[in-house]
Each structure stands twice: as structure tokens, then as C-alpha cells.
Amino acid sequence: MRPQELPRLAFPLLLLLLLPPPPCPAHSATRFDPTWESLDARQLPAWFDQAKFGIFIHWGVFSVPSFGSEWFWWYWQKEKIPKYVEFMKDNYPPSFKYEDFGPLFTAKFFNANQWADIFQASGAKYIVLTSKHHKGFTLWGSEYSWNWNAIDEGPKRDIVKELEVAIRNRTDLRFGLYYSLFEWFHPLFLEDESSSFHKRQFPVSKTLPELYELVNNYQPEVLWSDGDGGAPDQYWNSTGFLAWLYNESPVRETVVTNDRWGAGSIYKHGGFYTCSDRYNPGHLLPHKWENCMTIDKLSWGYRREAGISDYLTIEELVKQLVETVSCGGNLLMNIGPTLDGTISVVFEERLRQMGSWLKVNGEAIYETHTWQSQNDTVTPDVWYTSKPKEKLVYAIFLKWPTSGQLFLGQPKAILGATEVKLLGHGQPLNWISLERNGIMVELPQLTIHQMPCKWGWALALTNVI
């Protein structure tokens, strides 16, 4: 600064000194105590219910043997299930340990941008990656998992960071992480377990530091906890961590959590309820829930021995999505990449098929609410969603009637006001009221090539009761 400039700048500088300091980053007006009563009162961020559909990704060292299940280590070493024991005997030397799979987990062809593009094409609105499964191997360079993480072993890459950047730069999806609280064979956990969890060495030195590290470094907007190892939430200090997550963390305003925070917490505490794997009750629940399920009927991780009949068809997947959303849930659909980091053709096909279906019918899925009836009482495989502000009810039907007439027992038409359209077709359809309740809709006569989509269709009904 030159001396002659001082007089000219003195007044503005004085004003700056007199101005109040800039406000700190906004915190939620509500502060949460480290108690379930307080934490359970937190309102779930609206984006999660609006999203409806997410992708689960089970990937890790278990993708190297890629046999039987992602629980390979447990079934082989702990339960000693014969087919796993025989698999190891037939394919690896007697001295081979599970840890020896680590260097073989190369992720040689992993391309986060390609993954992100596939997920975007699927129509999903969020993803959840297994940052650490029950084996303890972390897909980031955890400071608390020395020599058993993706930086020190195998890929020599920060998988979590690469996917986080790709998702946030290339898509409109929310980024989420799965994290297993316990580890099957970690000596500190086993020692704590032997003390009936009176000792807390493992959560203090491993679990909690890693959770803070994950949230601060990668800012996941879904934190999907799992694997309590039979220990109560007090052992994990779950309420203390969640109070920090909701009050102080960089994702405090938008993060959603599930209900797996200690023995007895499932379907009782947390943000949204998962209840159990593949949970699909078929009826309305009083709390937001998620159906986490997997395309491979037998495993969450990739299996080399899987046959085509082991995978759910696109028709079955669309049905799961429709049933789940009609009953107020979200669908979290799982894939298992290969050890090389590729998404196999069958998984990619299912994802892209779901995306093409949602391009036509997403209006009946995203940002919808449950209706007074979840499914129809006259015609099977008809499920309802709604948008009350727009006075819209959607009837999603999974079988096209051969008669060309769709009978709906639940909606009551309003003469002169009700309008019915087929999504992807656009023209108003003819309908008549039935004698007691419901309506009969005349579907358009279309060839297979004129159909707006395959695997399920949606009617938009305006002004029905």
C-alpha cells in the first residue's frame, strides 16, 4: 500500500471495523440431545422421501473369491460350511488366509465416472457404497485400519473419494455410505465381547474414530449403519455420535440415517427403518422405511457361479419398486461389482432397464405420497400413489388386460371433473363409473411397439376420491 492511499481508505476501513462480524454457518434451530427420545424427534430431511429409489453397492475383498456370499470369510472360517471349505481346498494352497485376498483386490478396471453414468441412467436418486463391511477392510485410507484398507492394500486408491467426486460432479444423486460397526475377527472386538461388552476398547479406538473420519472427509448424506455384533447402542455410543451428526457435522441439515445402531434399535430408533433385509410388508407403515434388497437372490456381493435364474427379472424389480413406494417406502436395490471394479452386464442391464421405465413412469414414483388405498381390491397387481396438491392419483398396473379394459375398485370418479391419462401416451382416456365403487378405463389399442414402456404402466387420475 502506498502512503498517499491512506486517507482515501481510512473511512471504509473504519466502517468495516464498526460492522458486526459475519454470521457463523447456519446450524439447525433444533439442538438434539444424545438420547433416543430427542434424536427420534428429528424430522427426516424431505429429499429422502422424495427420492424413492437408490442403489446399494456391495464391494470389497469378498469380491475376490466371489463365491457363495459376501459372508465368505465367516462361512469358511467360523461356520466351516462344507462348500466354502471345499472351494478353498480346490482353489488355494493350504496356507492361504483370508487376508491374502487383500492384494488380489486390484480394482484394475474401476472407473468411478463410468459407475456414476450408469447410476444416473438407472433413475436412482441416491447411492450407498459399502465403505467397510464386517471383515474390516475399508475402501478409503482409514487411519484406524492400518494395512487393511484400499490405500495400503489392493487398489492403492481411495475408492470412496473417487466415487464421491464422480457422483457429485456428474450426477444429481446423493452420495451415501454403508458402515459396519463391528468386525467379525478384530481382536479388540472379540475381547470386548468376552467381557459382555463392559469393555469398550473397539468402539473407542476403531468404530467411532472411523465414523467421524468418514463424515468429515466424505460428507455422506446417507449414513447406513449395520452390524452391531450383538452389542447394545450404549456400547457403540450411538446416541452421542448421532447427536454430533445432527448438531455439528458438515451434513447436519441433509443427512439421513437408518435404524441399525445397536442390538434392539431396529424398527425402534433412527431416521428411517430398514426392519430386516429385503423387507417388503405390502402394507402401510407409520414410519418412513426402506426396502433394501438385492438383484442377485442369493448374495449381496458378486458371485461368479451365479446363473441367470439367480437374478431378479426387470418385471420383478419394477414390481418391488411399485409395491414399496405405494406403501410409503424407498427401494434400495443392490448390485455387486467384480474384483476388477466392473459392473457386470446383467447388473448394468437391470439398472438401465429401470431407468428407461422411470423415464416414462417416474411421475408416479418420485415425490409422491401414499394414497388412502395402497393396492386395488378388484384387479390384482394395481398399486396407488398420489400427489394431493395436484389432485392426482396414480394407478400403476403391472399386467396389461387382454380385454383392453382396466377395472379399478378404489377410485370414485367425479362427473365432469375426473380425467384419466396413460403416462407416456398423453391423450385422455374414456372411462365409466361402476355401479357401486370404482371406474372402468378403456385403455388405448396399441401395438407392442407403440406401448410407452414395458413391464408396467401408470394411469394419472385427476380429481378422484
From Swiss-Prot:
The modification Phosphoserine is found at S299. One of its GO terms (molecular function) is alpha-L-fucosidase activity. Its main location: secreted. GO terms for cellular component: extracellular region; lysosome. The record marks C292 as: May be important for catalysis. The keyword Ion transport does not apply. SMART domains: Alpha_L_fucos (SM00812). Its EC number is 3.2.1.51. GO terms for biological process: fucose metabolic process; glycoside catabolic process. It catalyses: an alpha-L-fucoside + H2O = L-fucose + an alcohol. Alpha-L-fucosidase is responsible for hydrolyzing the alpha-1,6-linked fucose joined to the reducing-end N-acetylglucosamine of the carbohydrate moieties of glycoproteins. Belongs to the glycosyl hydrolase 29 family. This is Plasma alpha-L-fucosidase. It comes from Pongo abelii (Sumatran orangutan).
